[in-house]
From Swiss-Prot:
One of its GO terms (molecular function) is mRNA regulatory element binding translation repressor activity. Sequence-specific RNA-binding protein that regulates mRNA cytoplasmic polyadenylation and translation initiation during oocyte maturation, early development and at postsynapse sites of neurons. Binds to the cytoplasmic polyadenylation element (CPE), an uridine-rich sequence element (consensus sequence 5'-UUUUUAU-3') within the 3'-UTR of mRNAs. In absence of phosphorylation and in association with TACC3 is also involved as a repressor of translation of CPE-containing mRNA; a repression that is relieved by phosphorylation or degradation. Belongs to the RRM CPEB family. The record marks 410 as: Important for the positionning of RRM1 relative to RRM2. This is Cytoplasmic polyadenylation element-binding protein 1. Interacts with kinesin, dynein, APLP1, APLP2, TENT2/GLD2 and APP. Both phosphorylated and non phosphorylated forms interact with APLP1. Interacts with TENT4B; the interaction is required for TENT4B-mediated translational control. Residues 310-407, 429-510 form the RRM domain. Residues 159-194 are annotated as: Disordered. Disulfide bonds: none annotated. Phosphorylated on serine/threonine residues by AURKA within positions 165 and 196. Phosphorylation and dephosphorylation on Thr-171 regulates cytoplasmic polyadenylation and translation of CPE-containing mRNAs. Phosphorylation on Thr-171 by AURKA in embryonic ovaries at 16.5 dpc (mostly pachytene oocytes) activates CPEB1. Not phosphorylated on Thr-171 in embryonic ovaries between 18.5 dpc (diplotene oocytes) and metaphase I. Dephosphorylation on Thr-171 by PP1 in embryonic ovaries at 18.5 dpc (mostly diplotene oocytes) inactivates CPEB1. GO terms for biological process: cellular response to amino acid stimulus; cellular response to hypoxia; cellular response to insulin stimulus; mRNA processing; negative regulation of cytoplasmic translation; regulation of mRNA 3'-end processing; regulation of neuronal synaptic plasticity; regulation of translation. GO terms for cellular component: cytoplasm; glutamatergic synapse; meiotic spindle; membrane; nucleus; P-body; postsynaptic density; ribonucleoprotein complex. The lineage of its organism: Eukaryota, Metazoa, Chordata, Craniata, Vertebrata. It comes from the Eukaryota. The gene is Cpeb1.
């Protein structure tokens, strides 16, 4: 049913040149409207369709576009007799292809209440939803929204000009809707499965000719840009023509602006998306590149009568090991329990699914002397390059004999390191360091960050209830410059002879009020230096809905239950 480009250009020329032929009958849309009316069982009233010839003066003012490329790529405007098309954009009635003359109830009062004539309005909604005209959506179920992603299915590709396909926007409805779902409009009026009806709709010319639009600007406009943007210009002009004043928008228009949701398009749909983003940021070291690298040997460790945590790490355990096997092997050193690795410490006493260990496990003894006894039974090399004593214990399982596993204890003195005891520790100059390696103690962490940024006065390793490290720490600087350098670095790669690990640096967070409203708690922190403050939920959404700030990632304190 689609027309060729040459035929479309010829029909446009006929519409302007022939004064004796009625507008509706000469345009290619006339037969289409009649066939649509036939499908509707002649429910549309064509008695008031205007047949007055078009004013000749308009044609004289238009440029000759018989051989113009703009003519070939344009679609016809349907003028009515009640108006002489102005030299600018067409008004709302002109854009509606003469539908006002089809006696469509409620056309002249799109903001009427819901208790208007429902039967006539249903007929109007059906036709207008087929045309996908922005004014049709005023009466439909998604007022003043742009075209949906696939309003006519695959038949959308049959439109002759690229401007229709180029103007498809994935936006939410601008204003409130009578329907709980925009998809409800797809089932009203006609069945979307009618191929014949789709062919009719795909053949409609619903945009004004490009030469007609070209006269609206102060200077010449690029035909290519006009081909893409003509649909947007048309919709904006139509909305401006029908939009009521701010004082006359009582029910369907909650705000004075015609486009109230443009400012809300960037807002997250889920109000709890901030928490999800904050949780994802905690694992950012796994997916981000390091901005700087430290390589070298860790400072030697010299202990005199060290005190150990009652919890030890076992690495490289046999894959078929069971909890009973672990208890039977290590209970000779004292009473103990087994903690299997679990997500965020959940169900730590339960083995993984399928009873398949991840290759490591934690042993928790009741007494610290049990750990000493275990280490004495291990083989170790005290002369390692980094000054670290590595402990290995031989154990067996049902299918593996004499497997050597690594035992990593934790000395309580390694949890804190103070470089300057007289220096006051300022939380506002403290950074949080995540994704630490298990062999990294506070002294080594302080030395690494002092080499990179300078000014370190304190370093601490975060521990659990058994005083065993949990993989994070804190470092305090004595000046703001070093602190900001560390925060800006964000990701640092640490290379030693024993391991290579990428750590993550963030500002250390405290309990604080929102620094915008100063009335609500501020659990969310923006680490970008444009913001760099605490926010409550409402102030976060308000601040970060602005252009250029939407990419900021939130931080939250990792509060354990």
């Amino acid at each position: 049913m689609a027309f060729s480009l040459e035929e479309a250009a010829g029909r446009i020329k006929d519409c302007w040149d022939n004064q004796e032929v009625p507008a509706l009958s000469t345009c290619s849309n006339a037969n289409i409207f009649r066939r649509i009316n036939a499908i509707l069982d002649d429910s549309l009233d064509f008695s008031k369709v205007c047949t007055t010839p078009i004013n000749r003066g308009i044609h004289d003012q238009l440029p000759d576009f018989q051989d113009s490329e703009e003519t070939v790529t344009s679609r016809m405007l349907f003028p009515t007799s009640a108006q002489e098309s102005p030299r600018g954009l067409p008004d709302a009635n002109g854009l509606c292809l003469g539908l006002q003359s089809l006696s469509l109830t409620g056309w002249d009062r799109p903001w009427s209440t819901q208790d208007s004539d429902s039967s006539a309005q249903s007929s109007t909604q059906s036709v207008l939803s087929m045309l996908q005209n922005p004014l049709g959506n005023v009466l439909g179920k998604a007022p003043l929204s742009f075209l949906s992603l696939d309003p006519l299915g695959s038949d959308l590709d049959k439109f002759p000009a690229p401007s229709v396909r180029g103007s498809r926007l994935d936006t939410r409805p601008i204003l409130d809707s009578r329907s709980s779902s925009p998809s409800d409009s797809d089932t009203s009026g006609f069945s979307s499965g009618s191929d014949h009806l789709s062919d009719l709709i795909s053949s409609l010319r619903i945009s004004p000719p490009l030469p007609f639009l070209s006269m609206t600007g102060n200077g010449p406009r690029d035909p290519l840009k006009m081909g893409v943007g003509s649909r947007m210009d048309q919709e904006q002009a139509a909305l401006a023509a029908v939009a009521p004043s701010p004082t006359s928008a009582p029910k369907r228009w909650p705000g004075a602006s015609v486009w109230p949701s443009w400012d809300l398009l960037g807002a997250p749909k889920d109000p709890f998306s901030i928490e999800r983003e904050a949780r994802l940021h905690r694992q950012a070291a796994a997916v981000n590149e390091a901005t700087c690298t430290w390589s070298g040997q860790l400072p030697p460790r010299n202990y005199k009568n060290p005190i150990y945590s009652c919890k030890v790490f076992l690495g490289g355990v046999p894959w078929d090991i069971t909890e009973a096997g672990l208890v039977n092997t290590f209970r000779v050193f004292g009473s103990l329990s087994v903690e299997w690795p679990g997500k965020d410490g959940k169900h730590p006493r339960c083995p993984p699914k399928g009873n398949m260990p991840k290759g490591y496990v934690y042993l928790v003894f009741e007494l610290e002397k049990s750990v000493r006894a275990l280490l004495q039974a291990c083989s170790h090399d005290p002369l390692s390059p980094d000054g670290l004593s590595e402990y290995y214990f031989k154990m067996s399982s049902r299918r593996m004999r004499c497997k050597e596993v690594q035992v990593i204890p934790w000395v309580l003195a390694d949890s804190n390191f103070v470089w300057s005891p007289s220096q006051r520790l300022d939380p506002s100059r403290t950074v949080f360091v995540g994704a630490l390696h298990g062999m990294l103690n506070a002294e080594a962490l302080a030395a690494i960050l002092n080499d990179l940024f300078g000014g370190v006065v304190y370093a601490g390793i975060d521990t659990d209830k058994h005083k065993y490290p949990i993989g994070s720490g804190r470092v305090t600087f004595n000046n703001q410059r070093s602190y900001l350098k560390a925060v800006t670095a964000a990701f640092v790669e640490i290379k030693t002879t024993k391991f290579t690990k990428k750590v993550q640096i963030d500002p250390y967070l405290e309990d604080s009020l929102c620094l915008i409203c100063s009335s609500q708690p501020g659990p969310f922190f923006c680490r970008d230096q444009v913001c760099f403050k605490y926010f409550c939920r409402s102030c976060w959404h308000w601040r970060h809905s602005m252009e250029g700030l939407r990419h900021h990632s939130p931080l939250m304190r990792n509060q354990k239950n």
